Regions:
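Short pre-catalytic strand/loop immediately N-terminal to key active-site residues, enriched for Gly-Thr
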Residues: 10-20, 247
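Hydrophobic beta-strand scaffold residues
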Residues: 37, 63, 149-150, 181
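Short beta-strand/loop segments at the ligand-binding rim of alpha/beta enzyme cores
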Residues: 145-154, 159
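Conserved phosphate/ATP/ADP-binding segment of small-molecule kinases
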Residues: 159-246
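Alpha-helix C-terminal capping segments
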Residues: 25-36
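A short helix->loop->beta-strand "cap" motif at the edges of active sites that frequently abuts
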Residues: 141-148, 220-224
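Positively charged, low-complexity intrinsically disordered leader regions
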Residues: 1-8
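Conserved N-terminal subdomain of the carbohydrate kinase-like
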Residues: 36-122
Length: 247
C-alpha cells in the first residue's frame, strides 16, 4: 500500500494498492521475457489472495503450485521519497500465511516437478523463524534434485525481528546457492564479508566490486557466480544504476 505520488502517509486519505514481492517480481519479469515461470508461496483462503493470484496469472506466471492455508496477506506500506526526503517502508508481515508456514507444509516432489531453477530472496527467511526454516528446507530439497538455486540476498534490517541475525541464517542458506545477487550492504550484513566502502554515502568505488565478488566466491566455492548491483544515489528519486558479474 503506497501513499499517492510523493505524499506522506495519509497526507490524503487514501493508499494505492499493488501486489509485489522480491520473488514475485522476478517471476513476472521472466514471464515477460517469454520464459516459463512458476510462483511458489503460501497464501490465505480469501478474496484478497485470489486477486493476487489473478494478478500473477495476468502476467503469465503459473500459479498452480501455490499452497492455500490459514493466515493473512502480508502488507508493506510505502512512502515514496523525493529529493532529500528518503523513502519510508513500514512492514506488516506478522501472522501472514507465509510467515506461519513451516517445514513439511510443502510437498517438494510436487513443487519441484519439471523445475530446473529455483529463486529465493533474503526477504522470505527474514519474515519469521518458521519461514526461515522453510526457506532452508526449500534450498536443500532443490539441491537434492540438482536444481540450480539463485538467491537475491536482499537484506532488510526491519524484517529481522525474531532473534536471529541475518548473517546467522544467510551464511547457512548461501551454502546451497549457485547464483547470488547482492549489493555491497547485502554482502556485509548477510554474509559478514566486509569491503572498504561506505555503503551509506551513496558513492561508488567501482574498483572494489570485482574484489568483493571474488571474496564471496572464495568463501562459497559452491557458488558459480555472483551479480553485484551498484547504485549511486544522488537523491531519493535520482539514482545511477549499474551491475557487475563475477564468475
Amino acid at each position: 500500500l503506497k501513499a499517492p505520488g510523493h505524499e506522506r502517509f495519509f497526507q490524503s486519505p487514501m493508499l494505492e494498492a499493488t501486489f509485489g514481492g522480491g520473488e514475485a517480481n522476478v517471476a513476472i519479469s521472466l514471464a515477460n521475457y517469454g520464459m516459463d515461470a512458476e510462483f511458489l508461496t503460501v497464501l490465505p483462503k480469501n478474496d484478497i489472495a485470489e486477486c493476487c493470484i489473478r494478478e500473477l496469472r495476468y502476467f503469465g506466471v503459473d500459479t498452480k503450485k501455490i499452497v492455500r492455508s490459514e493466515g493473512r496477506m502480508g502488507i508493506y506500506y510505502l512512502e515514496g521519497g523525493a529529493n532529500q526526503l528518503p523513502s519510508k517502508v513500514v512492514y506488516d508481515r506478522a501472522y501472514s500465511s507465509i510467515a506461519l508456514a513451516k517445514p513439511g507444509d510443502i510437498d517438494w516432489d510436487k513443487a519441484f516437478e519439471g523445475v530446473d531453477w529455483f529463486h529465493i530472496t533474503g526477504i522470505t527467511p527474514a519474515i519469521s523463524e518458521s519461514a526461515m526454516e522453510l526457506s532452508l528446507e526449500a534450498v536443500k530439497e532443490a539441491k537434492k534434485r540438482n536444481i540450480t538455486v539463485s538467491c537475491d540476498l536482499n537484506y532488510r534490517k526491519n524484517l529481522w525481528k525474531y532473534g536471529k541475525k541475518a548473517s546467522e541464517v544467510m551464511r547457512e542458506l548461501a551454502k546451497y546457492v549457485d547464483v547470488a545477487i547482492a549489493n555491497e550492504e547485502d554482502v556485509q550484513k548477510s554474509l559478514e564479508i566486509t569491503v572498504d566502502v561506505n555503503v551509506e554515502s551513496g558513492e561508488l568505488d567501482r574498483k572494489k566490486y570485482k574484489a568483493l565478488g571474488n571474496k564471496v566466491l572464495e568463501s562459497y566455492p559452491n557458488m558459480k557466480c555472483i551479480a553485484i548491483t551498484l547504485r549511486e544515489s544522488h537523491s531519493a528519486d535520482w539514482n545511477g544504476w549499474a551491475a557487475c558479474l563475477n564468475d
